[in-house]
Amino acid sequence: YIGFGSMTAGDMAETLDIAREAVLLSGVRAVLSTGWGGVDVPPAENLYVAGFVPHDWLFDRVSAVVHHGGAGTTAAGITAGRPTLVVPFGGDQPFWATRVKALGIGPHAIPRDRLTAPRLARALVDLTETPKYRVAARELGERLRLEQGEFIAANIIEHELRKWLREEDRAPDPVLEHNHAEPPAPAGPPD
């Protein structure tokens, strides 16, 4: 999978052309998501071009993911246990690129402003053929899935909400007290 999600910075047509050329140079098979780019990219024998595809469905069916490094896409790739290459555009994306490398689930990032087809082609081969990335990504994905993060987060939110509602029941509400108070006496005639 190669996709840059909601990224519209710079020339997305150029970015997608670089990705397409890298797939052709490397010989890997890929799904290229055009995302919000609104760009037409010609398919090839080893390249399927798609608009938006649900990551939680697709990432289970690919061998690796290449993306912009948004928190959501990074988490989806890790949860699926897939080696990851980040092409950060800006914002928090360099942070996630650093984490991917530190966790051993992918190679050094290629910042968007340094992205070339030959550089990406080499990274695609490295990403898909280096066993240590596959092993580390699979192990991390298994650990993450065992955490049941959504279930735990929902329980914490519900617990805190119940606690907050109980505190609200005990605390006086100045607005309600004001609404139930006796109206003030009318003012007398001016002196």
Language-model-derived ranges and their functions:
Residues A117-D191:
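C-terminal amphipathic helix plus adjacent low-complexity
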Residues A50-R99:
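A donor-sugar binding/catalytic signature common to diverse glycosyltransferases
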Residues D11-T15, W96, G149:
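Residues at alpha-helix caps and immediate loop-helix transition turns in enzyme cores, especially N-
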Residues M7-D11, V49, V87-G91, I110-D113:
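Short, contiguous acidic/charged loop-to-helix segments that flank catalytic cores in large enzymes
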Residues Y1-A64, H178-H180, D191:
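Donor-nucleotide binding loops and adjacent catalytic segments primarily
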